Amino acid sequence: MIPVVIEQTSRGERSYDIYSRLLKDRIIMLTGPVEDNMANSVIAQLLFLDAQDSTKDIYLYVNTPGGSVSAGLAIVDTMNFIKSDVQTIVMGMAASMGTIIASSGAKGKRFMLPNAEYMIHQPMGGTGGGTQQTDMAIAAEHLLKTRKTLEQILADNSGKTVEQIHADAERDYWMSAEETLAYGFIDEIMANNNLS
């Protein structure tokens, strides 16, 4: 069930679902697994808010275990494509593809709540059972290319070398807010809502 908010206007009462009300304040919620439908919704909201006023920041709240690389990269590409700065605020966790999205916010405007967590790792992939050897080789080559792309994005977003990212992402690498700040993925840990 989605909560409803009621506002008093000069013309009477108006009710909004909570997400529509947040959108009025340029807030987008990216929660749950990153998949095509969720990504399409986030992308549509980014494009709408940018078209509405590209001089104002957009606030993207992130709480995701990660998910689809292609869906996540579509969000990142849109964040980079639009003129509005996208502030990212990690709450709960940003893991896997979530770290790529959250760290791709506008430099100087990437935030994290004190008890949130970050996790990087290498991308996962596979081919179902009964797959031909040639298809397995193609899938493995694609996975290696994907890993290089993601490692380059994380290196660009953190200031670390690709080699450092590669080594740290070999297995699940969890970080607290303080560790994430020291690593360079965020710019500030927020104790209260001081976004402007």
Swiss-Prot record:
Keyword Cytoplasm: yes
Keyword Protease: yes
Subunit structure: Fourteen ClpP subunits assemble into 2 heptameric rings which stack back to back to give a disk-like structure with a central cavity, resembling the structure of eukaryotic proteasomes.
Alphabetical keyword list: Cytoplasm, Hydrolase, Protease, Serine protease
A GO CC annotation given for this chain: endopeptidase Clp complex
Protein's cellular compartments: Cytoplasm
GO biological process, one term: protein quality control for misfolded or incompletely synthesized proteins
Protein name per Swiss-Prot or TrEMBL: ATP-dependent Clp protease proteolytic subunit
Molecular function terms from GO: ATP-dependent peptidase activity; ATPase binding; serine-type endopeptidase activity
Family from the record: Belongs to the peptidase S14 family.
Source species: Streptococcus gordonii (strain Challis / ATCC 35105 / BCRC 15272 / CH1 / DL1 / V288)
Active-site residues, record numbering mapped to chain: S96 (nucleophile), H121
Catalysed reaction, written as an equation: Hydrolysis of proteins to small peptides in the presence of ATP and magnesium. alpha-casein is the usual test substrate. In the absence of ATP, only oligopeptides shorter than five residues are hydrolyzed (such as succinyl-Leu-Tyr-|-NHMec, and Leu-Tyr-Leu-|-Tyr-Trp, in which cleavage of the -Tyr-|-Leu- and -Tyr-|-Trp bonds also occurs)
Superkingdom of origin organism: Bacteria
Pfam families reported for this sequence: CLP_protease
